[in-house]
């Protein structure tokens, strides 16, 4: 019986089974190598990704995160500065818009004040010129406005004294020109005698 089993020919089915069993054993090493390569490549890719990712993460970590309080403060500061700049720009535009009107108003007020001052000075000078024509003056007189007013007051006082005296003749009263000339001469003499200097000192 042993000889029969050993000498019995192997059927094709047995060969195919044995071959099929050997083929997976032969194919396993390449698959293992491929798996190893895939694992190595995946590790390399993971390591490379981790490297740039780490760098990127470090860059992000070095800066402020979007939700960090430092960046929030900076954001608020930048927003505040931007708002202030906008407000400053708005104020400049409003002031620039209102400045020409205020400048024109100031100019018109100054012009009107200058016109009023010129009119007042002109009328005052005309009044003093008329007063100097009435008051008897000496050729050497260079009277200021205050001196002219004082001389006019003294001349009025002199005229009052002349009217109170009996020296005024009726003929002199009838001729106004002669009366004015004599009064002017008398007033000039009165001034030169020192009455004016004494009154001016007071």
Curated annotation (Swiss-Prot):
Organism: Homo sapiens
Name of the protein this chain belongs to: Twist-related protein 1
Keywords from the named record: Activator, Biological rhythms, Craniosynostosis, Developmental protein, Differentiation, Disease variant, DNA-binding, Myogenesis, Nucleus, Repressor, Transcription, Transcription regulation
UniProt-listed Gene3D superfamilies: Helix-loop-helix DNA-binding domain
PANTHER family: BASIC HELIX-LOOP-HELIX TRANSCRIPTION FACTOR, TWIST, TWIST-RELATED PROTEIN 1
Places the protein is found: Nucleus
Lineage top rank: taxon: Eukaryota
Basic residues composition bias: residue spans: 34-43
Function, as annotated: Acts as a transcriptional regulator. Inhibits myogenesis by sequestrating E proteins, inhibiting trans-activation by MEF2, and inhibiting DNA-binding by MYOD1 through physical interaction. This interaction probably involves the basic domains of both proteins. Also represses expression of pro-inflammatory cytokines such as TNFA and IL1B. Regulates cranial suture patterning and fusion. Activates transcription as a heterodimer with E proteins. Regulates gene expression differentially, depending on dimer composition.
Subunit structure: Efficient DNA binding requires dimerization with another bHLH protein. Homodimer or heterodimer with E proteins such as TCF3. ID1 binds preferentially to TCF3 but does not interact efficiently with TWIST1 so ID1 levels control the amount of TCF3 available to dimerize with TWIST1 and thus determine the type of dimer formed.
Domain (bHLH) ranges: 108-159
Transmembrane segments: none
Single GO term (MF): DNA-binding transcription repressor activity
